[in-house]
């Protein structure tokens, strides 16, 4: 091997190591545009510190995260401006750092930076982060985020939990989101840990996840999806779910997991099978489905197994994950009274679609020119004073809230996964069930609203002043207006959420931009 080849090999290995290495809790995130080919097809993308998916951010419960976003984006097609949402964090007292463009901030301009500075005093588990401007995260600005608990109550169930046990799932498109169809009919490829194949690139590299026989692994499964849900399984292995969306659950053994856009699960895998290679499968709900040529797949490789593709076969799932079977590890009281509508403020979200835009209670969300938080800080308190008109719901403080999402054929593209910012919520009625559980339902932050006939119902307590986005996490549906803002405790929002000068500077800088620089 020549010295040059040796150096090149070292550089490539080093880059691979960098891609795996976690950053945080204090870190710079430099955003640029670069050509990438995660499935063997080259296209321009939005990358973070040179890679997509973005680097794993990691810290510990109680940490202060200081994440400096440096916007060096130059490709107008994928937007030069940006903002980043830290998905699943309560942001109590730092609503300004929640990262939703035109709800919590103005976007960051190219050539500028912005420091997201927030505390995580009482949360641990699996999170993620992504652009919250238009459909930008579909073009690559998305990555996993883990907060470790030094006193994890389930630590006895596993031996290994580290950077290498995070598994990301992403849909990948060969055309930038802004240039493709308004509602794509499916992704070109499914990426598992940033690698995958499309039907036309079946020789591309696949992700390899290594295990040692006899060890128990806590895998953290993160859906970075823009659109499809995926059914995840590992040939020859069961999975014991112990966390959903950063909430510890009672252990539940399953053999497949349907994971919707933006959801996360931790599961324990006991590497007790013969030393071999096993297919990891993540079948999307639509588009390029199946596993021909190794699409929608990765490899679980036991130490000592040959470096070849698996020959294992998929068996029919007999223990699929059912959300209604998930229960919190420690009791979490459900807000309100144990009866339908037994809350201080019930809300019903009626979905519709006109062929172009989605509507909730007859209003399609159009991002306002002044962020909702800035409107509130400027003195607007009542719903009738806040824009966009009809899309902002003012919620009283210290109150129990119930939201019902009756699924209907009037809003195609089901099931729609809905995410509430600033909270976890009790899922008192899950998709596929007509039962209400006020005793021990799962708490989470993204819920499937199911199919026509379902009436998924959630509850939470208003203990976090500020405007919080509630939206479909299919990014193409959000872009088409499938969202509302819940403005919680508007009278106390300013006092609880003091904003830094750098935040106040964002809007004047953004508003002065030429349209070609947006």
UniProtKB/Swiss-Prot annotation:
Carbohydrate-modified residues: 72, 75, 229, 354, 362, 398
One BP term from GO: lignin catabolic process
UniProt keyword list: Copper, Disulfide bond, Glycoprotein, Lignin degradation, Metal-binding, Oxidoreductase, Repeat, Secreted, Signal
Stretches of the chain forming a coiled coil according to its record: none
Enzyme class: oxidoreductase
Needed co-factor(s): Cu cation
Catalysed reaction, written as an equation: 4 hydroquinone + O2 = 4 benzosemiquinone + 2 H2O
A cellular-component GO term for this protein: extracellular region
Chain positions recorded as Cu cation 3 binding sites: 132, 421, 471
Residues binding Cu cation 2, per UniProt: 87, 130, 473
Gene Ontology molecular function, alphabetical: copper ion binding; hydroquinone:oxygen oxidoreductase activity
Source organism, top-level taxon: Eukaryota
Chain residues that bind Cu cation 1: 85, 419
InterPro entries, per database record: Cu-oxidase-like_N, Cu-oxidase_2nd, Cu-oxidase_C, Cu-oxidase_fam, Cu_oxidase_CS, Cupredoxin
Keyword Electron transport: no
Glycoprotein is among the record's keywords: yes
Cofactor: how bound: Binds 4 Cu cations per monomer.
Main location: secreted
Plastocyanin-like domain residues: 23-148, 160-302, 369-489
Binding site for Cu cation 4: 416, 472, 477
Induction remark: By lignosulfonate, veratryl alcohol and 2,5-xylidine.
Signal peptide interval: 1-21
Family: Belongs to the multicopper oxidase family.
Protein name: Laccase
Native species: Pycnoporus cinnabarinus (Cinnabar-red polypore)
């Amino acid at each position: 091997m020549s010295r040059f080849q040796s150096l090149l090999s070292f550089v490539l290995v080093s880059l691979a190591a960098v891609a795996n290495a976690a950053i945080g809790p204090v870190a710079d995130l430099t955003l640029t545009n670069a050509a990438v080919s995660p499935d063997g097809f080259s296209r321009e993308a939005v990358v973070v510190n040179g890679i997509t998916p973005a680097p794993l951010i990691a810290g510990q419960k109680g940490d202060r995260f200081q994440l400096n976003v440096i916007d060096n984006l130059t490709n107008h097609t994928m937007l030069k401006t940006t903002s980043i949402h830290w998905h699943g964090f309560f942001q109590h007292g730092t609503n300004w750092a929640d990262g939703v463009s035109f709800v919590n901030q103005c976007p960051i301009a190219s050539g500028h930076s912005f420091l997201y500075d927030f505390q995580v005093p009482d949360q641990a588990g699996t999170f993620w982060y992504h652009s919250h401007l238009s459909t930008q995260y579909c073009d690559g600005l998305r990555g996993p985020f883990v907060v470790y608990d030094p006193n994890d109550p389930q630590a006895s169930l596993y031996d290994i939990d580290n950077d290498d046990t995070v598994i990301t799932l992403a849909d990948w498109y060969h055309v930038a989101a802004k240039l493709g169809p308004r509602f794509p009919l499916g992704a070109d490829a499914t990426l598992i840990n940033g690698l995958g194949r499309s039907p036309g690139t079946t020789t591309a590299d696949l992700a390899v996840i290594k295990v040692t026989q006899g060890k128990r692994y806590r895998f953290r499964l993160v859906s970075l999806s823009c659109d499809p849900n995926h059914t995840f399984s590992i040939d020859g292995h069961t999975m014991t779910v112990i966390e959903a969306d950063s909430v510890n659950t009672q252990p539940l053994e399953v053999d497949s997991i349907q994971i919707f856009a933006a959801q996360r699960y931790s599961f324990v895998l006991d590497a007790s099978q013969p030393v071999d290679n096993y297919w990891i499968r993540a079948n999307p709900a639509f588009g390029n489905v199946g596993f021909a040529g190794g699409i929608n797949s990765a490899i679980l490789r036991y130490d000592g197994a040959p470096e070849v593709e698996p020959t294992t076969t998929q068996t029919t799932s007999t223990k699929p994950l059912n959300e209604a079977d998930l229960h919190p590890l420690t009791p979490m009281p459900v807000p309100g009274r144990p009866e339908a509508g037994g809350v201080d403020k019930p809300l019903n979200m009626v979905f519709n679609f006109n062929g172009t835009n989605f509507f909730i209670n007859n209003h399609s969300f159009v991002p306002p020119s002044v962020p909702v938080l800035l409107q509130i800080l400027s003195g607007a308190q009542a719903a009738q004073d806040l824009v966009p008109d009809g899309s902002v719901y003012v919620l009283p403080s210290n109150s129990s809230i119930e939201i019902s999402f009756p699924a209907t054929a009037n809003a195609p593209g089901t099931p729609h996964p809905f995410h509430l910012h600033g909270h976890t919520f009790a899922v008192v009625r899950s998709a596929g069930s007509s039962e209400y559980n006020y005793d021990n339902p799962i708490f989470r932050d993204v819920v499937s609203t199911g199919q026509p006939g379902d009436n998924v119902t959630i509850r939470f307590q208003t203990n976090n002043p500020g405007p919080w986005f509630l939206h479909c996490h299919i990014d193409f549906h959000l872009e088409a207006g499938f969202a509302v803002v819940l403005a919680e405790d508007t009278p106390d929002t300013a006092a609880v959420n003091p904003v830094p000068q750098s935040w106040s500077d964002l809007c004047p800088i953004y508003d002065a931009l030429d349209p070609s620089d947006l």
